[in-house]
């Protein structure tokens, strides 16, 4: 997050955020989040699994073009409540989210967030979007490389898996050993 803070400042943004979905471990594709947003918002976002209802994430993951938040329909209550709550935590109205794909079929979203006035934001966005797309690819590449170099989780034998399964249903060690 420290590097993102430096990048956000250098780019004149209020916030810069990366949300990635990678197949790691037994949990499938839990999101990897690196962000300059308020830590309280990040905690809430993760605890409530907001990535499952976040219209920005949804639209970004289904497409390949940058998603300007102002172009998202905000007609349903869930979306309005989500954006309202985000604003309470300092997330600004102006944002653009960039979908990222990688060779390992990972998906991610890089989000730029600003409190510029709308006409300034549109001009700023036009001037920065190509660099932001490239930045997203660099961040994704770095994160995927770090995930690949992480030691793999423990591999369980068939018998070890069977023992865990029996323990999970309440069998004693003696019963499992029979």
Pin down the residues of each PLM region.
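Helix-to-coil/beta transition segments that act as allosteric "coupling" elements at the rims
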Residues: 80-105
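Regulatory loop-to-helix N-cap segments in sensory/regulatory domains
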Residues: 115-129
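GAF sensory/regulatory domain recognition
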Residues: 20-44
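Sensory-domain boundary capping and coupling elements
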Residues: 101-116
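Regulatory sensory and allosteric helical modules in signal-transduction proteins
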Residues: 35-88
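Helix-turn-helix DNA-binding segment
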Residues: 146-178
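Short, hydrophobic-rich beta-strand element in sensory/regulatory alpha-beta domains
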Residues: 2-9, 13-26
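Signal-transmission/dimerization alpha-helices at domain junctions
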Residues: 131-147
């Amino acid at each position: 997050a420290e590097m993102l803070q430096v990048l956000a400042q250098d780019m004149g943004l209020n916030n810069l955020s990366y949300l990635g979905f990678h197949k790691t471990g037994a949990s499938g594709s839990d999101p990897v989040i690196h962000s300059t947003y308020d830590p309280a918002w990040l905690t809430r976002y993760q605890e409530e699994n907001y990535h499952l209802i976040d219209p920005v994430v949804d639209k970004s993951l289904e497409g390949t073009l940058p998603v300007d938040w102002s172009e998202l329909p905000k007609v349903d209550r869930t979306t309005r409540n989500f954006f309202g709550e985000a604003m309470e935590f300092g997330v600004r109205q102006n944002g653009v989210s960039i979908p990222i794909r990688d060779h390992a079929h990972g998906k991610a979203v890089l989000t730029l967030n600003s409190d510029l006035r709308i006409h300034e934001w549109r001009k700023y966005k036009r001037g920065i979007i190509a660099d932001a797309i490239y930045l997203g690819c660099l961040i994704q590449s770095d994160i995927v490389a770090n995930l690949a170099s992480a030691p793999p989780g423990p591999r369980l034998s068939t018998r070890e898996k069977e023992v865990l399964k029996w323990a999970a249903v309440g069998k004693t060690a003696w019963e499992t050993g029979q």
